[in-house]
Design a protein with these regions (language model features):
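Non-catalytic interaction modules of co-chaperones and other macromolecular assembly/maintenance factors
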Residues: 1-170
């Protein structure tokens, strides 16, 4: 038993000290990834070596992309004319944007894969994919001429205007 223990360590031989360190965070980390910083942990007992500091990461959700392992998922709206007739669509990526070809008769919920446009694998085994899911949007307001043209289209289609609902009811 110490007769006069130190005021800083109370006789334990160690005292608490706050410090900042810089860690290199590799590409591909996800929530729960644990990084180790050697000898930046608690001081060793009786002059022994310092312990290691472990930092558990929490990755903030992205405003555009959802993540499933190394793959990214992105939902993009398209107009119903592009869905029906096909066309080109510019989509966001981690590094900018890319164009995808939308085939005619594309349905809402269809997913297009852009290989290698996801997140780098933490162990260095390639890169995930970017999966773009399209949501077909119908105009909220139509003028008289647009309504007339759509009605004309519906009349031309007859019973085939909604083929999926037909198979659903059978």
């Amino acid at each position: 038993v110490l007769e006069k223990p130190c005021g800083d360590c109370r006789g334990g031989g160690r005292k608490e000290k706050k410090s900042s360190i810089t860690l290199k965070v590799p590409e591909g980390v996800n929530t729960g990834t644990r990084l180790r910083s050697s000898t930046n942990g608690e001081a060793g007992l009786q002059g022994g070596p310092n312990g290691d500091l472990y930092v558990i990461l929490h990755v903030r959700p992205h405003e555009i992309f959802d993540r499933e392992e190394d793959d990214l998922i992105c939902e993009v709206p398209i107009c119903f004319v592009t869905a029906a007739l096909g066309g080109e669509l510019k989509v966001p990526t981690l590094t900018g944007s890319a164009s995808i070809k939308i085939p005619a008769s594309t349905q809402s919920g269809t997913t297009f894969r852009l290989k290698g446009r996801g997140v780098k694998n933490l162990q260095g085994y390639g890169t995930g994919d970017l999966n773009v899911r399209v949501n077909v949007e119908v105009p909220a307001r139509l003028n008289k001429e647009q309504k007339a043209k759509l009605q004309e289209f519906a009349d031309l289609c007859g019973d085939d205007v909604n083929p999926q609902s037909k198979s659903f009811l059978e």
